[in-house]
Amino acid sequence: MWPFAPVPAGAKCRLVETLPENMDFRSDHLTTFECFNEIITLAKKYIYIASFCCNPLSTTRGALIFDKLKEASEKGIKIIVLLDERGKRNLGELQSHCPDINFITVNIDKKNNVGLLLGCFWVSDNERCYVGNASFTGGSIHTIKTLGVYSDYPPLATDLRRRFDTFKAFNSAKNSWLNLCSAACCLPVSTAYHIKNPIGGVFFTDSPEHLLGYSRDLDTDVVIDKLKSAKTSIDIEHLAIVPTTRVDGNSYYWPDIYNSIIEAAINRGVKIRLLVGNWDKNDVYSMATARSLDALCVQNDLSVKVFTIQNNTKLLIVDDEYVHITSANFDGTHYQNHGFVSFNSIDKQLVSEAKKIFERDWVSSHSKSLKI
């Protein structure tokens, strides 16, 4: 790439989806399987993966991706998979299946032991990257609805790799003093692009606050700012909205995002559509929150639907001008404690494509009224 070449619109980002086979529509976008396969096929030096857990062998397509990684590692490509210390259940089986892949467990909050690694992203050769809500599991690759972004624009991939370096510094096998020193070395150079300096209309946001480095944007600050500044429309497709934070088994009210949605509907007359998931992984407060929003804003332009098939898509669109794709729920525990990276864009084409996905999901036969 020429050093003074113009930045491509949208930083060469393409939307990526996993759609279960039992859905009544198909995607026009790259599939998660195709995305991961391309990253592996084109890799020459390294592939770095961050995911809460690692269970690719649970589906046929997931197993195919893991076999491709195994082949790449046997050819000398450096492969590191970061996973949370509490998500390592399948680690022994995977290590025996492929000893050349380096699996590293991390604990991003050894002091309080409440934070998890939620980030779902891949980076290869400082040239290609994926970020979204597909963890490195067979379900995310094949049977659970997910949404992410793939880019082969090197500056963006390099910026995401900085996040990998940050999470890697919290290797749970190291002692706390080494963790702190390592983190201190990588955090000051943790980002090049942010809300005030996007590249091609694209930037990343980060969580939690104690992992922020120089010029990073806190994800919750950006999300709430966008919700508070919404003028015409807010479209949300999420597994759950939970206005609480859980610590040591106790729940504490965390209304920041919840209140911002209500204020937009009641105070400013913003049209809001909320599509929530409804499956066994939902927080107990999730459906109660959806019903409370529906009831409280009954005199306003706020609609709530429930998606009946396993849906881990986490998407926010504001005023048809901004899109946010993340791996975290709008959940106080996630935003206060967990480590993740979100994708943000004001590029018109990317926002338009994300909007079409939301519209498709909203009118599909899988979306049911909350009142039914």
Swiss-Prot record:
It catalyses: a 1,2-diacyl-sn-glycero-3-phosphocholine + H2O = a 1,2-diacyl-sn-glycero-3-phosphate + choline + H(+). It is a lipid-anchor. This is Envelope phospholipase OPG057. Interacts with protein OPG190. Late-budding domains (L domains) are short sequence motifs essential for viral particle budding. They recruit proteins of the host ESCRT machinery (Endosomal Sorting Complex Required for Transport) or ESCRT-associated proteins. F13 contains one L domain: a YPPL motif, which might interact with PDCD6IP/AIP1. It is found in: Virion membrane; Host Golgi apparatus, Host trans-Golgi network; Host endoplasmic reticulum membrane. GO terms for biological process: viral budding via host ESCRT complex. GO terms for cellular component: host cell endoplasmic reticulum membrane; host cell Golgi apparatus; membrane; viral envelope; viral membrane; virion membrane. CDD domains: PLDc_vPLD3_4_5_like_1 (cd09106), PLDc_vPLD3_4_5_like_2 (cd09107). Residues 307-334 form the PLD phosphodiesterase domain. Keywords: Host endoplasmic reticulum, Host Golgi apparatus, Host membrane, Host-virus interaction, Hydrolase, Late protein, Lipoprotein, Membrane, Palmitate, Viral budding, Viral budding via the host ESCRT complexes, Viral envelope protein, Viral release from host cell, Virion. It comes from Vaccinia virus (strain Ankara). Its EC number is 3.1.1.-, 3.1.4.4. Major envelope protein that plays a role in the biogenesis of the viral double membrane and in egress of virus from the host cell. Produces the wrapped form of virus that is required for cell-to-cell spread. Acts as a lipase with broad specificity including phospholipase C, phospholipase A, and triacylglycerol lipase activities. A motif (YPPL) lies at residues 153-156. GO terms for molecular function: phospholipase D activity. Belongs to the orthopoxvirus OPG057 family. Palmitoylated. Attachment of the palmitate moiety is essential for correct intracellular targeting and protein function. It comes from the Viruses.
